[in-house]
Amino acid sequence: MTIANDPIVIVSAVRTPMGGFQGELKSLTAPQLGAAAIKAAVERAGIGADAVEEVLFGCVLSAGLGQAPARQAALGAGLDKSTRCTTLNKMCGSGMEATILAHDMLVAGSAEVVVAGGMESMSNSPYLLDRARSGYRMGHGRVLDHMFLDGLEDAYDKGRLMGTFAEDCAEANGFSREAQDAFAIASTTRAQQAIKDGSFKDEIVPLSVMVGKEQVLISNDEQPPKAKLDKIAALKPAFRDGGTVTAANSSSISDGAAALVLMRRSEAQQRGLKPLAVIHGHAAFADTPGLFPVAPVGAIKKLMTKTGWSLDEVELFEVNEAFAVVSLVTMSKLEIPHEKVNVHGGACALGHPIGASGARILVTLLSALRQKGLKRGVAAICIGGGEATAMAVECLY
């Protein structure tokens, strides 16, 4: 069968709660978070653990986790020892890239059932002892922060934080501090409402963690309820004196994981499964590394060309809020109304566990579409290094 007649479908989509930095999920490693998401995704798909042939999982801050973090997560989820596993690092796009590669693997006939997603425990990212391997002959040494070096800093302009490029984007495109704060407040308000009315309930697998000497069940995202909206306007710029980007209108450091089960529609039919959605296409875009905040615009444009969709036909968008300005510039350049974007809030409120976010926004997009009885959605994410990826899905009812 051709891909048009037998498309790739998503059978289940699950995420963990998003934990704050050094917060409720700090006792769990990235593979443990990934294992929880994978186990729940497989169970909700209605397949046996031995049915999964391949696991593709994103993880950016892998130093100190031990060999093959994706394999650890898969076996931790109870998958069969025969399951092949690959850990991916495409920065913030890792979780979505894992899903893209899972899609293409299924199209190629290399597997019949694949789990894709991403995981990150930013709380547990270690410090690195620079030059310790070769030795310190004399003078001062230094300790490097794995999270900053490999997650939050530009690789080309050494030591430059991602937030400074967000500042450049805001200035170049005329987004004021007030506009960015207003977006962050809307994101947080939406997330708080989603928690209050149970909109996240279907997409989250609760986690049991030790808090002090007690075992506690964590079923909600940690950070939105703690946000103090009245304090946002008073925050100092985080990246540049006199700048407009703050801790509130940026994504927060976070822990979490997300997983999706993919297969061909014919495979789902043979197994008696009811898919959540069809993947209609995916696209990637790359430009100058410092222009990563604008890259989702290019990825979405390419995606519309590949799918034959128009932007007006897309009913909901998830555009990862690495910084508020990323979503703002995407909405502005593509003329997308805010009412269609991140309807349950985004990373400014929930957090941005780097390797997981690309999968997390897909999970949240599918959940929001189904709750509202809508069909077509697009998820897009900017990626450090000047890239972005985007994916188009259509819900099945």
Feature locations, PLM:
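Flexible glycine-/small-residue-enriched beta->alpha junction loops
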Residues: 113-169
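Conserved active-site "lid/cap" helical segment
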Residues: 2-65, 69-77, 84, 168-177, ...
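Conserved catalytic cysteine-centered active-site region
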Residues: 59-114, 156-162, 226-252, 333-360, ...
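Active-site-proximal alpha-helical scaffold in enzymes
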Residues: 88-120, 170-199, 259-266, 331, ...
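N-terminal extracellular/periplasmic Venus flytrap/periplasmic-binding protein-like
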Residues: 14-16, 27-35, 44, 179-270, ...
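Active-site pocket-lining segment
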Residues: 165-167, 203, 210, 280-349
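Condensing-enzyme catalytic core mediating Claisen C-C bond formation in acyl metabolism
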Residues: 1-30, 229-294, 298, 305-306, ...
